[in-house]
Amino acid sequence: MSSLVRLKFNAIKLVIDFGISENIAYLISIFLPIVLLLVISVLGVLVTVWLERKISAAVQQRIGPEYAGSLGIMQAIVDGVKLLIKEDIIPAQGDRWLFSIGPVLVVTPVILSYLVVPFGKNIILSDIRLGIFFWIVISSITPLGLLIAGYASNNKYSLLGGLRAAAQSISYEIPLTLCVLSISLLSNTLSTSDIVEQQCKYGILSWNIWRQPVGFITFFIASLAECERLPFDLPEAEEELVAGYQTEYSGIKFGIFYVASYLNLLVSSLFAVVLYLGGWNFPIPTTLIFFISMYKVSLPLDSSNLLLELIIPIIHISITLAKTYLFIFFAILARWTLPRIRIDQLLDLGWKFLLPMAVGNLLLTASFQLTLFEFS
């Protein structure tokens, strides 16, 4: 029994011990991971926003937020509360229903993507065998939400921003998918957990970044474009389109777009870690034999096993998040150091450079796998 299944079983048993019926306890066990996922996602966004403000301040030789909490850590929460209490304005000539459903279609696929992200060994909400395929399919819904948001606003800037967002997402989703398929072909699996497991044998030397360097570079650039980060933030270029498809949005709906942007950056970084940087695996190959024997000297067997069950998941999650925020650091650094490119340059980069690179990388990976199959 995995640690996650055991934790769920113990939680149900604990709720039943408090006098709650089994049916209600089972419902709680179903919805609790969903609530936990939402809370963790929001916390991840708050940390990412704070990091971006501090890093951008350092790049521009400023101090950044410092008064709202220690080191300005509460500034993102204050801004979020401010957005929640602002008036939600709907354009008089716009489509009210589509205007409201646009942000939902943008943020929902991003949140659902976290279901198949392994934060540690057996620490995953839904370990389906088609995890990579699920992420690719669910992320393809986001451009539809952006296009609907731009169309429903009945504003020329919003419509142009929505069209740009859809064109950009389609252009860069294809090379991104081909890079993911190369990793899947190399690992002979579509499961995110299995992909990480295959990168643990020799430590950092087993990571897929060494076997797929071209794929990693292509994935990094395409993921930045998918997240609409500078230098690829053409759909909301202030000098050209005011705020793009977000122009007519305010209050909580604008906040949903804002949160979705950072959630997308976070989930893209997590998948980069899972696919290329070994996931929860430590860079140096280690074994737990010495760790277990050290604690067995002074602790009973049950106590040492219980301690390991508590410590190992924490270590796995910490390693995954450390790699993720390292990836986010470079994404933030790119935003504040590179100039915005033109829309024609954006599409040329996607179709004329990244797509051929991704196709060539996939063909080389397939040839390599066929050669190994012939000699095995």
From Swiss-Prot:
One of its GO terms (cellular component) is chloroplast thylakoid membrane. Disulfide bonds: none annotated. It comes from the Eukaryota. It is a multi-pass membrane protein. It is found in: Plastid, Chloroplast thylakoid membrane. GO terms for molecular function: NADH dehydrogenase activity; oxidoreductase activity, acting on NAD(P)H, quinone or similar compound as acceptor; quinone binding. Keywords: Chloroplast, Membrane, NAD, NADP, Plastid, Plastoquinone, Quinone, Thylakoid, Translocase, Transmembrane, Transmembrane helix. The keyword Iron does not apply. It is an enzyme of class 7 (translocase). The keyword Metal-binding does not apply. One of its GO terms (biological process) is aerobic respiration. Its EC number is 7.1.1.-. Pfam families: NADHdh (PF00146). InterPro entries: NADH_UbQ_OxRdtase_su1/FPO, NADH_UbQ_OxRdtase_su1_CS. Belongs to the complex I subunit 1 family. NDH shuttles electrons from NAD(P)H:plastoquinone, via FMN and iron-sulfur (Fe-S) centers, to quinones in the photosynthetic chain and possibly in a chloroplast respiratory chain. The immediate electron acceptor for the enzyme in this species is believed to be plastoquinone. Couples the redox reaction to proton translocation, and thus conserves the redox energy in a proton gradient. NDH is composed of at least 16 different subunits, 5 of which are encoded in the nucleus. This is NAD(P)H-quinone oxidoreductase subunit 1, chloroplastic. The lineage of its organism: Eukaryota, Viridiplantae, Streptophyta, Charophyceae, Charales. The gene is ndhA.
